[in-house]
């Protein structure tokens, strides 16, 4: 996946930190979240919404699956309205799940199923839509893998047909260009 996976969108600090989906103690440091999930990141001063903490705070039994993080991205585009030029700001939530524990292509089969992807994405997107009607969700769930062995993992991901229109494997270094 080239580094243009985000289509010109960039992390929106203000919108993320003001998101109505946040509940107590769910706005967390991105690098700390990556570390908790078994990875390492040099990204600093970036806060994301911990979807696992939100899910756990709801007290739903059985506990549903969720994506690991959500955050808001935005991009501005210039357009002409008659003789006037205007700027349009577009925003959306990104949902990502860290898969740093998948260290070899064979583990793609053991650690990720289509049902897992669907369950994580469906719960997370329905929660966000229920709390924030002003900013839409991206319709793609991003699964973030370590840069090591990424090509082999991505090939297995594609052959397993996990790279559906609703999910996409992205290597960590490409994912982090959004910040």
What is each model feature region?
Residues 63-64, 90, 115-118:
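Generic alpha-helical scaffold signal
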Residues 69-71, 92-103, 124:
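Conserved catalytic cores of phosphodiester-cleaving nucleases, focusing on short active-site segments
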Residues 1-65, 73-78:
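Acidic-basic catalytic patches of nuclease active cores, encompassing PD-(D/E)XK
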Residues 60, 84-89, 132-134:
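Short, charge-rich binding segments
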Residues 72-95:
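Active-site beta-strand-loop-beta-strand hairpin of nuclease catalytic cores
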Residues 101-152:
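Catalytic cores of nucleic-acid endonucleases
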Residues 133-179:
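Domain-level recognition of nuclease-like catalytic cores that cleave nucleotide substrates
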């Amino acid at each position: 996946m080239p580094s243009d996976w985000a289509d010109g969108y960039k992390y929106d600090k203000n919108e993320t930190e003001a998101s109505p989906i946040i509940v107590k103690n769910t706005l967390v440091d991105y690098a700390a979240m990556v570390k908790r999930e078994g990875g390492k990141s040099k990204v600093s001063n970036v806060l994301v919404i911990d979807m696992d903490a939100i899910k756990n705070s709801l007290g739903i039994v059985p506990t549903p699956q969720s994506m690991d993080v959500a955050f808001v991205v935005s991009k501005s585009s210039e357009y002409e309205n008659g003789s006037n030029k205007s700027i349009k700001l577009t925003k959306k939530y990104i949902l990502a799940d860290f898969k740093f524990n998948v260290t070899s292509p064979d583990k793609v089969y053991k650690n990720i199923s289509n049902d897992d992807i669907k369950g994580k994405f469906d719960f997370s997107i329905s929660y966000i839509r229920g709390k924030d009607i002003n900013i839409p969700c991206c319709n793609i769930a991003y699964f973030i893998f370590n840069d090591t062995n990424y090509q082999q993992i991505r090939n297995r991901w594609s052959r397993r047909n996990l790279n559906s229109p609703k999910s996409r494997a992205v290597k960590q270094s490409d994912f982090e260009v959004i910040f």
